[in-house]
């Protein structure tokens, strides 16, 4: 009888609610974020833009057009051209409103991956983060972005960790992340490979892929030993991890 070592157990990644539990509630709304927390997400993910008067607001697109409800008083417009007062009149699906980043960070019981969609918003985001109570869940948040200059501003002015979003994992992306002092890299799950994940981990960075919504994508994420799983459906990922990892 020969001695055979057992394979190392798969680590259990943290579940990140992508725009909240956006499979079950209107994306990037307080309802979606609450649902994600109820469904077992350990972190939330949101997108932020600047309003015309400098308010950091939570929305993915540059305009309200795609997510606005059909009966909204205001149905079209760019976030950067609308004031906070105008955005307050916008009605989203399910009767939800456009939240501010401050509102989300006040209500959350978990850290947030805050995606800065435009580099110009970085300073305002930094000011909000700096003002957070040290012991609050939101104080453990991470800023993520495709814009290296936005992440550099966050690193320069706050103690908040950052994760560099990339379309492809290569030597240049890893080098940029290290130069930024980033805690991780966030590639699309569609381009993630075991070789890429190993290179990121060897560089001392976390692997934070997006967006995992199918069984094949989940299997890739687990095989790559990712640190977080960003998904539209935290409850589904929770069930899958329970079955696969116990």
Predicted segments, located by residue:
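Conserved, mostly hydrophobic/aromatic
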Residues: 18, 36, 47, 87, ...
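Conserved N-terminal beta1-alpha1 strand-loop-helix module at the mouth
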Residues: 8-60, 68-72, 126-128
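N-terminal amphipathic alpha-helix/helix-capping segment at the start of soluble metabolic enzymes
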Residues: 1-17, 152, 198
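Active-site beta-loop-alpha junctions enriched in small/polar residues
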Residues: 20, 49-53, 61-62, 117-119, ...
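Metal-dependent phosphodiesterase/phospholipase catalytic core, i.e.
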Residues: 12-13, 60-161, 165-167, 203
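Hydrophobic faces of well-ordered beta-strands that scaffold small-molecule active sites
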Residues: 15-17, 44-46, 112-114, 141-144, ...
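C-terminal active-site rim and adjoining tail of enzyme catalytic domains
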Residues: 91-98, 163-246
């Amino acid at each position: 009888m020969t001695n055979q070592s057992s394979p190392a157990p798969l680590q259990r990644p943290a579940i990140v609610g992508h725009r909240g539990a956006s499979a079950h509630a209107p994306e990037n709304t307080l309802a979606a974020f609450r649902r994600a927390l109820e469904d077992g997400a350990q972190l939330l993910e949101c997108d932020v833009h600047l309003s015309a008067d400098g308010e950091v607001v939570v929305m993915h697109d540059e305009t309200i057009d795609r997510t606005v409800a059909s009966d909204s008083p205001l149905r079209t417009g760019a976030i950067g051209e609308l004031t906070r007062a105008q955005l307050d009149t916008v009605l989203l699906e399910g009767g939800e409103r456009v939240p501010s980043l401050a509102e989300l960070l006040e209500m959350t019981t978990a850290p947030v991956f805050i995606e800065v969609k435009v580099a110009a918003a970085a300073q305002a985001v930094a000011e909000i983060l700096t003002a957070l109570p040290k012991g609050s869940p939101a104080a453990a948040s991470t800023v993520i972005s495709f814009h290296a200059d936005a992440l550099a501003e966050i690193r320069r002015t706050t103690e908040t960790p950052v994760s560099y979003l990339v379309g492809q994992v290569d030597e240049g992306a890893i080098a940029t992340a290290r130069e930024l002092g980033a805690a991780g890299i966030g590639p699309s799950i569609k381009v993630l490979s075991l070789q890429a994940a190993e290179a990121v981990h060897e560089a001392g960075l976390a692997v934070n892929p997006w967006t995992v919504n199918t069984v094949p994508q989940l299997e890739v994420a687990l095989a790559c030993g990712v640190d977080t799983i960003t998904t539209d459906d935290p409850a589904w990922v929770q069930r899958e991890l329970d079955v696969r990892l116990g």
